[in-house]
């Protein structure tokens, strides 16, 4: 299980990303529309002044039950280890084990 501080840090990043999402998106649209290089540099400086953790690239998917940041399945929101355990216990409807 992931440490509580790492899970809280990830939640803080999600809140920051939601808070600055519109500002970041509008600034990126402005950069593509402005023809002069000086204006682009000013807008780029505005983007750089935003908090680093507000960038969407810094977010990680985490397992819903354990908080593990690796080997996550998007469809379920679980890590592979927990997904396998839940399928074996028949806790996920519609999921079947493969056999060939």
Curated annotation (Swiss-Prot):
Superkingdom, natural source: Eukaryota
Keyword Cell inner membrane carried by entry: no
SUPFAM superfamilies according to UniProt: Glucocorticoid receptor-like (DNA-binding domain)
Stored PROSITE patterns: RIBOSOMAL_S14
A GO MF term: rRNA binding
Pfam families: Ribosomal_S14
GO terms for cellular component: chloroplast; small ribosomal subunit
Keywords assigned: Chloroplast, Plastid, Ribonucleoprotein, Ribosomal protein, RNA-binding, rRNA-binding
Gene Ontology biological process: translation
Cysteines paired by S-S bonds: none
Keyword RNA-binding: yes
Localization, UniProt: Plastid, Chloroplast
UniProt subunit comment: Part of the 30S ribosomal subunit.
Family: Belongs to the universal ribosomal protein uS14 family.
HAMAP family: Ribosomal_uS14_1
Job of this protein: Binds 16S rRNA, required for the assembly of 30S particles.
Protein name per the record: Small ribosomal subunit protein uS14c
Lineage of origin: Eukaryota, Viridiplantae, Streptophyta, Embryophyta, Tracheophyta
